[in-house]
């Protein structure tokens, strides 16, 4: 039989809408598109629809997304937070259950499921050092976001652990964008800086860097090595295929969805909120 559940009738019985609000800071970014897709699929399997909003990496748009979700009476929210924690924590911690993904705020009770970016930053830097690179350009994303801050911390700690090797480095950049990667590489390498490797904090930054290197006539990996964060499949189809730190997006989507649904479906409130960091994986290719 072709049975279609009546969500309105179910909602009247349970005071639920079976709808979850999901906000990400750039659905045109392949990373956030993939992350959103995994969340939506897991919520669908659990019987929930998803209302998707794009904050465009802007705090006011993020706050507007939260307001819109409340006006639509969503049962819960999964959010990549954007903005100053002291200004938006109250906006997040309302009466609607909320789980953060990709980014989190320390010293709060907000649940989160995120990549362990410190481990990833350390791992990427250890790999470059192990390959013999001694002058590393680190191109970060949004400077005050936890992914960037934790990757920088891991990057610096890995270098400090090899102080005997006298590694030189610079940390530049301010966005998880193609333009950021392109502009930083074009400017720095045009000035004759002697970096022998690049750590790109996202696949979008990487693409910009690759474009700049080609315009400058600098060969990868013959003249400069590259490692990138993110697990977009197209990185294997670049020439050369890109060595990367792969994030566990499927697991993040599954665990975040389950954590939120557990709260919605009357999980005891005295249980501490789920706050979990998941280790990424080093995928070695040709770059």
Model features per residue range: what roles?
Residues 1, 46, 94-96, 162, ...:
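Helix C-cap/helix->beta junction micro-motif
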Residues 1-18, 153, 285:
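N-terminal helix-turn-helix DNA-binding module of bacterial transcription factors
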Residues 7, 15-126, 130, 189-190, ...:
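Alpha-helical recognition/docking segments in bacterial nutrient-uptake
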Residues 17, 36, 133, 152, ...:
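ATP/adenylate-binding site constellation spanning eukaryotic-like Ser/Thr protein kinases
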Residues 22, 73-81, 137-140, 171-172, ...:
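Periplasmic-binding protein-like
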Residues 24-34, 52-61, 103, 113-123, ...:
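Hinge/beta->alpha junction and helix N-cap segments in small-molecule ligand-binding domains
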Residues 38-42, 91, 150-162, 187, ...:
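Alpha-helical structural signal in soluble globular domains
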Residues 166-167, 186-187, 191-287:
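Flexible loop/turn connectors
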């Amino acid at each position: 039989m072709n049975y279609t559940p009546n969500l309105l009738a179910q909602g009247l019985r349970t005071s639920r809408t079976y709808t979850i609000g999901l906000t990400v800071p750039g659905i045109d970014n392949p990373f956030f598109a993939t992350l959103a897709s995994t969340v939506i699929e897991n919520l669908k399997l659990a019987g929930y629809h998803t209302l998707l909003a794009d904050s465009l990496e802007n705090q006011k748009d993020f706050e507007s997304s939260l307001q819109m979700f409340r006006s639509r009476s969503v049962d819960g929210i999964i959010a990549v937070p954007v903005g100053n924690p002291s200004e938006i924590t109250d906006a997040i911690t309302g009466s609607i259950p909320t789980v953060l993904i990709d980014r989190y705020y320390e010293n709060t009770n907000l649940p989160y499921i995120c990549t362990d970016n410190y481990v990833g930053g350390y791992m990427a830097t250890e790999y470059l050092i192990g390959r013999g690179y001694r002058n590393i350009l680190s191109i970060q994303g949004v400077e005050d976001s936890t992914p960037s801050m934790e990757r920088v911390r891991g990057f610096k700690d890995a270098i400090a652990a090899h102080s005997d090797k006298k590694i030189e480095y610079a940390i530049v950049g301010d966005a998880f964008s193609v333009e950021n990667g392109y502009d930083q590489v074009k400017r720095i390498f045009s000035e004759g800086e002697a970096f022998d490797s690049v750590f790109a904090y996202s696949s979008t930054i990487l693409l910009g860097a690759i474009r700049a290197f080609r315009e400058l006539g600098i060969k990868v990996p013959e003249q400069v090595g590259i490692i990138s964060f993110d697990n977009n499949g197209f990185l294997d189809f670049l020439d050369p295929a890109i060595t990367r730190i792969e994030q566990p997006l499927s697991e993040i989507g599954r665990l975040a969805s389950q954590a939120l649904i557990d709260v919605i479906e009357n999980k005891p409130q005295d249980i501490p909120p789920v706050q979990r960091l998941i280790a990424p994986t080093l995928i070695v290719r040709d770059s």
